[in-house]
A protein has these predicted regions:
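Catalytic cores of nucleic-acid ligases and guanylyltransferases
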Residues: 1-293
Length: 293
């Protein structure tokens, strides 16, 4: 398997599928991450393919307990003192310099919630059905130290249990949704019907086509939405602005552009970055950005 690997994605659906061929997993509000345990050490990959090892050194260290040749798919999460998953804390960590990330890891350690095995020391397991990959993942993680921050995502074959999680764990614990996965499905990159999700806040991905403000501290982004409309986002949070600034250094010479409503911005090449935005805001004059993909 070659770095970076393309990840499987879930389709948004209005309700969870029914039937005996489905498994249901908690969807946690963190940062999607592929954990690579190689002969040389551990590398951590973002969904976009970026190397994010430096920001998550505590998880990279924990990954050394995995056998070489292991590749896992999962979510990096950080919890607050009251036990709630904090996307803001994960965002701050992801945007930090290595020095600050190390300090934040000491204050608020991260957990890696694994939900799939892509490769084991025996080889690529993506063609195998989900039920077999899940069993292999649980067996693998059972051999890690008791104090490891690497854990398997909670899952059930009972739809009613999954709906109870969805309805009761959002406000208290930060569970943002449920992902249903067909037990017989292989791991396929992209968005397929084999993975389906419901979540409390629906989102879409938007192509970043520019920014406003200084290159080193962008104030807002210009994005192209799935319907083709171009728009500015709301003001970026400090962590998201810092993350975007790291990407913009590769943007090249600056040119001016304007949105469909004639709002000026500085252009960047299409395809350089993608952000997740709240779906409910895509009809508004400005959209709400959540995270860098």
């Amino acid at each position: 398997m070659d770095w970076p690997v393309s990840v499987a994605l879930a389709q948004s659906v209005p309700e969870l599928p029914t039937g005996t061929d489905w498994n249901y997993e908690m969807k946690l509000d963190g940062h999607r991450m592929i954990m690579w345990r190689t002969d040389d050490g551990v590398r951590l990959q973002a969904r976009s393919g970026r190397d994010v090892t430096a920001a998550w050194g505590d998880l990279a260290l924990a990954g050394h307990h995995l056998p070489a040749g292991t590749v896992l798919d999962g979510e990096a999460v950080i919890t607050t003192e009251d036990g709630r998953i904090s996307f803001e804390a994960a965002q701050a960590r992801a945007a930090s310099s290595p020095t600050r990330a190390h300090r934040l890891a000491t204050q608020c350690p991260a957990h890696y919630i694994a939900f799939d095995a892509l490769q084991l020391p025996s080889g690529d397991v993506r063609p195998r059905p989900y039920s077999e990959r899940r069993a292999a993942l649980l067996s693998l993680l059972a051999g890690l130290p008791a104090t490891t921050p690497i854990q398997a995502v909670s899952a059930t074959t009972d739809r009613d249990t999954a709906l109870t999680w969805y309805n009761t764990l959002h406000n208290k614990h930060g569970v943002e949704g449920i992902v249903a996965k067909r037990a017989t499905s292989s791991y396929r990159a992209g968005r397929t019907g084999a993975w389906q999700k419901i979540r409390h806040a629906e989102t879409v991905d938007a192509d970043v086509i520019g920014y406003t403000g200084p290159l080193t501290r962008p104030r807002a982004l210009a994005v192209r939405l799935p319907n083709g409309r171009t728009s500015l986002t709301q003001t970026l949070s400090a962590p998201l602005a810092a993350q975007i600034a790291q990407v913009l250094v590769a943007a090249g010479p600056a040119e001016k552009g304007s949105t469909d409503t004639s709002e000026a911005y500085t252009k960047i090449p299409s395809g350089l970055a993608t952000v997740e935005v709240l779906a409910g805001t895509t009809r508004h004059a400005v959209v709400t950005p959540l995270r860098l993909r």
